Amino acid sequence: MNFLFDTQLTKEDNLLKKFEEIHDYIYANDGLSPQQTLEEFVKILFIKIYDENDNLNQFTISSEEWNELKSGKLVHAISERITALFEQTKKAYRDIFDADDRIRISAMALGFTINKLQNISLLNSSQDAKGLAFQKFLSHHEKDGRGQFFTPEPVIDFCVAMMQPKPNEMIIDPACGSGGFLMSALRYLQQNTEGVLDVAKTVSENLFGSDINKSIARIAKMKLLLEANGKTNIHCVNSLEDLDSLKLTLGHSDGFDLVLANPPFGAKMTNPAVLSKFDLGYKWSNQNKEYHKTKAVYPNRNAEILFIERCLQLLKEGGRMAIVLPNGNFENPSLEYLRYYIKLKAKILAIVNLPQETFIPFGTGVKTSLLFLEKDTPNKDRQYPIFFGRITKLGYQGNKNGTPQYLKDKYGQVVKNELGQPALDEDFSEIVEAYKAFQSGKKVDANNSFSINYDELNGRFDYDFYSPENRKMFTKLDSGKSVRLGDICDIIKVKSKKLKDPNKTVEYVELSDINTHAYEIINSTIYQVHELPSRASYEIEDGDIVTAIAGNSVGTRKHATALVNKDFAGSICTNGFRVLRNFKIDTYYLLYFLKSDVFLKQMFMYRTGAAIPNVSDIDLANTLINLPDEKIMKDISSKMKKAFELRQESRNQIESIVLELA
């Protein structure tokens, strides 16, 4: 059966329309989920490309066959022809297909798909047309299908622009998902290479990707196949397996120039055989502020921690990497050994903080940052500057739809870029320019970027900790009379003995029971001990101060701090508080300071945790309390005390009115 291809397909929207029609037909008629529909569509594209590559002319349906299908008849020849073709396709792409994979769409949907695609050559049509069509198609369906492998395109492009890949550099994404980083690197090279980039050569020789999920790896492979009709280096493999085996699978053992990765967040690795192959799979001990690997393997580790080590292993000396990580890796005290390891193995090029809403359109509100490193195993030069940046405008809304946000002029009109397209309201490009200026030796002086020297870096990597605003605050505190909170009071963190009696009735105070403007507890809930939430912990006394150390409000204007009065003495409070007692300075002055901007900024700076922010007991004890001269302290204390007395007096008057009416 011979037919003519339409090789004049130059508008990607024509092909996109066909892709959408096929997807919508399968989804509407075959009862598959969005994810399953996408997977089946990608299988069909592989069959189509295999048929074209080998000039088999089997990806066809005659008008007679199509009419018979539409009339409700079974046409076995079509299914037999495509099934046989799929068996050959699976063998040709055995690294991303299993032998028992099958086509799961109906004969009618299969016929509809073949009829739409049979007269189009995916190999001979415009590279731009087919590549852009597939990219647009995926952008419509990836989030619905598999949000977990989707990294926001602005974040991907930003990482690539920061790393500035060069022609002939070997680039890998060891958790490649649908290939976003690799495609962005290819686009960057096309736009920034003198002359015309040899796309086929770049794809076949310089771009590598691996993913543990075959259906996702197929999408990445298809993206690259549509860009270059030749060999691709996308493999379905666990990148955390034995390093030598991984290099053998990849077919490249000399190390890579650039690693780009957004590893899976929070997935626990529990296999001791895997964990024992990583330095970071072992427990580390702290000896005089230096960490040393012990012989004890962790029972489990988050996958992204192991990916950090694997990415460094994949790099050649002097190679660079960009990796997306939850903020906990940058700040949690329990992961300081991880940051020590990174400092041992690499030069820290840059750290860029992302807004919390970055990944909300893609299924998670976890706070993340970007870490940019250069492999430097000898690590001789410890005197170098480190760039810090903060993204505040993403170019899209932090809602489930990720609606684009466009830059507007003072009249509210959307601004156009140099290509005449609406310009996104983002500051990724501003940070890239600031980083390039930093690389050239210029002083960083932008709104959301700064630099520090390596010797100023302590056990944390987060933007807020080193921001110029916070550094100025500490300089001011250090120059005045300041004391550690832990030196002027006891910080109670011992569980109440009342909790040992399961039938005892107690009053329980939560974070939400605080009037944050009035510094007071306004409510408690009566429970028997066995009914209490697991976070119920500390007994509070009259005259104590409770202050929050956990939750999204910590360090903000809604930070919960309260003076305990006799009405709530003996209550049990949540472990989201710490109880302050036995004060060495005036209680009312301390209460005032705990709501000051200086204290709140310190608490916000000390926050750690990607999901639920919290402040460690060590950091709480280390917060600095400014002590002005005695006259000012007494004046503040007197006003605070008077305010509490007036509030109590007003309550007493209201209660007396109620009694008179009774």
Task: Describe the role of every protein-language-model region.
Residues K43-S139:
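Long recognition/docking surfaces used for binding and targeting
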Residues Q148-A261, G266-T270, P326-G328, L338-R339, ...:
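Conserved S-adenosyl-L-methionine
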Residues K293-F359, T364-L373:
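Conserved Class I SAM-dependent methyltransferase catalytic core
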Residues L371, A569-R578, R607-K634:
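A short glycine-rich beta-alpha junction/loop motif
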Residues D425-K498, D629-A662:
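Non-catalytic DNA-recognition/assembly elements of restriction-modification systems
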Residues V444, N448-I452, S467, D597-I625:
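Specificity-determining recognition surfaces
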Residues V483-K497, I514-D544:
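Sequence-specific dsDNA recognition surfaces
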Residues D542-L594:
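A short beta-sheet element
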